[in-house]
Amino acid sequence: MSKNPLGTLVVRIWKAKNLPNKALVGKQSPYCVCRVGEVVKRTQTDKRSGQEPSWNAVLEFNIPSESYHIMKITVFHEGFRKHPHLIGDTVLSFEKAMKEELQSEWYELKNEFQFAGELSVQFKFIPTDPLYFDRASSKPVLQFPYSSVAALTPVPKKPSKPSKPRKKVPVSHPLPPTPPSREEHVSVPRESSLFTYEDDPLPSFPSPYMVDDYYTQDVFVSDNVNDYSYGVQNPTNPRLSVEDYDANHSSLPPVPPPHLILPTASSSQIFH
């Protein structure tokens, strides 16, 4: 703060109304906190006054310059163990009091952009210089003129050239191509080169009589083993004949040799 302030602002926090009740049980105990710049002061707590407290508190603030004309007032409820609960706040200007010495109004409180009651505040500014209000009233006020020199003097306009008539040129838009007809879209090329039956032993669509004739033909198997080498493998051992090779590699078990019947002696000959 400067040593020679502009003056002293006397604030009277009178009363409030329509405050929301923040007390869980019983009536609330509200108080106000005022701030101007970096200076913060508060009122006394009105015990159990509820929604319409009355403080009638007077606070003084030193105003260093005319730029300090904004005040923020916050109303709290003093809960258990003096824990503060926000009721509402407002930001107001006392610039009118710095020009006319007095200002008294009701101000609306808000809490998260919702209505939280009204607060009655009075301002009185006491300047350090006794001629402060005379100087403030004698200051020239710049008013916006109703007419200016620029508005009275017309701006010269350049002569406009005569416009040439425009020729209308016909514009031709190409038509979209005609879609193919359904017959052309579904048609199948009938070229003989696409379907050849020369390499096929049977036609693609045989008749039932042709199928019966084809599958009922007699199949003759050659007796020569060498003609069907894929059916019977050649013997790996050249000493074995084909009959021996087939006997050894047959899926059936081999036939046992016949038993030899030897002559046996009778019991009379043995114990003779």
From Swiss-Prot:
InterPro entries in alphabetical order: C2_dom, C2_domain_sf, C2_fungal_Inn1, Ingression_C2_domain
Self-association state and partner proteins as the record states: Interacts with cdc15 and imp2.
Name of the protein described by the UniProt record: Ingression protein fic1
Family membership: Belongs to the INN1/fic1 family.
Domain C2: 1-107
Keywords, ordered alphabetically: Cell cycle, Cell division, Cytoplasm, Mitosis, Nucleus
Pfam families hit by this protein: C2
Biological source species: Schizosaccharomyces pombe (strain 972 / ATCC 24843) (Fission yeast)
One GO cellular component term noted in the UniProt record for this chain: mitotic actomyosin contractile ring, intermediate layer
Compartments where located: Cytoplasm; Nucleus
Task of the protein: Involved in the ingression of the plasma membrane during cytokinesis, leading to the separation of the daughter cells. Unlike its S.cerevisiae ortholog INN1, it does not play an essential role, probably because the actinomyosin ring is connected to the cell cortex by many more proteins.
Example of a GO biological process term: establishment or maintenance of bipolar cell polarity
Region (Disordered): 155-187
The keyword Transcription is annotated on this UniProt entry: no
Signal peptide coordinates: none
Biased composition (Basic residues): 158-170
Major site of localization recorded for this protein: cytoplasm
GO molecular function: cytoskeletal protein-membrane anchor activity; phospholipid binding
